[in-house]
Amino acid sequence: MATDWLGSIVSINCGDSLGVYQGRVSAVDQVSQTISLTRPFHNGVKCLVPEVTFRAGDITELKILEIPGPGDNQHFGDLHQTELGPSGAGCQVGINQNGTGKLVKKPASSSSAPQNIPKRTDVKSQDVAVSPQQQQCSKSYVDRHMESLSQSKSFRRRHNSWSSSSRHPNQATPKKSGLKNGQMKNKDDECFGDDIEEIPDTDFDFEGNLALFDKAAVFEEIDTYERRSGTRSRGIPNERPTRYRHDENILESEPIVYRRITVPHNVSKEFCTDSGLVVPSISYELHKKLLSVAEKHGLTLERRLEMTGVCASQMALTLLGGPNRLNPKNVHQRPTVALLCGPHVKGAQGIRCGRHLANHDVQVILFLPNFVKMLESITNELSLFSKTQGQQVSSLKDLPTSPVDLVINCLDCPENVFLRDQPWYKAAVAWANQNRAPVLSIDPPVHEVEQGIDAKWSLALGLPLPLGEHAGRIYLCDIGIPQQVFQEVGINYHSPFGCKFVIPLHSA
């Protein structure tokens, strides 16, 4: 009774721990209650062992996928089995990729003489006319469907890339019919249905193989070859190449020195430029001495006022919008700037800045209180300013009530601190705070107490003072002091301006 099932293709489910096995029954032992399968597949993957034996207690479910016919179980273990039909034609039994038997039509011929290849029409007629003997050697649709279910996705048949992708553009896609498609599948299996080689269960050791590669020896061999061939060597001491590549530096670059300016006293605050150069602050006494020595060497007050006015006006034009705001298309909306100046040298700097702004088609309103006696620099600047289209007012009531585009503050001077107690000064501070316009301070002093007008930007001259948070963002202006003048007052100076006359400073 047990021998009747030899050669059958079965599927054995051993639960979640062992999985599902498929194969052909090779032995059934009723005494020990075991069953053996040859060419087994475990969960769709071909096993490395040729035979697997199961106990009855391990089997959860057993399904019979195929029962051999009469006389088929005599040679079930062979790889190829041949049966002769009534017409003398044979069919060959092979093992497909999932291990189950597959019947492939192959005419048996005792002669090795070449055969004539039939035409395409003859092949079609032969495919349609199937003899009863050939039907016995072909599998049913259910058997082919069961084989496709048990086949693993990772072991699918390799396809011919030329046949699938290199079809002639004018060639029509063949229609798929049931009978013809099945015969084409069998022909593909004859060509591409080889058994897949066994895959080793050990992973490739990348680290171990990399350790076997001696890079030092290879590099030494390359260097030796280059020296013998006369080519440019790599890393040989006291040897210069004859030619340089286009991306090689001929001159070695020196290390960058970021601290190029040193002062003779302790620095209370340091700044840095966009390129990283350190700019130290100096005290008001040292700054005053620097301007005095520069004036003695020819940098007069008139020249200093002109440089300050030009740089401050350029910065103000940039803050107003630059070419986007000041162009012929925006004549109807000219920017408005309010100048708040005091009766001192810093006020004269603001008046000269206002004159340059007025020359650039900016509407300037200058506030300067009336005094009986003015400085000569103030008088000269007012004389030039009166020749522009700018407006001068001495009363805060004449200042615009609507917000302006920019307020330039030149009210404060460290030598005239008493002006902060004057009514006009307090009124000007109140107007600037109520106007809510951004404020630019030109050469602001250092105050122990907070200023009345908080600036958004501040422009320092030569070297910055240790300004606080009330000064806003600090900018530095080059007023043309020579390097030897800095050295005369004890400052080791190297220009941080580069190609500009006004540069921004950042807190270090």
From Swiss-Prot:
Short name of one Pfam family: Edc3_linker
Residue ranges of every copy of the Sm domain listed in the record: 1-68
Listed SMART domains: FDF, LSM14
Residue ranges constituting the DFDF domain according to the UniProt record: 192-228
InterPro entries reported in the protein's UniProt record: DFDF, FDF_dom, Lsm14-like_N, Lsm16_N, Sm, YjeF_N_dom, YjeF_N_dom_sf
The keyword Cytoplasm belongs to this UniProt entry's keyword annotation: yes
PANTHER family reported in the protein's UniProt record: ENHANCER OF MRNA-DECAPPING PROTEIN 3
Job of this protein: Binds single-stranded RNA. Involved in the process of mRNA degradation and in the positive regulation of mRNA decapping.
Protein's name in the database: Enhancer of mRNA-decapping protein 3
Native source organism of the sequence: Pongo abelii (Sumatran orangutan)
Gene: EDC3
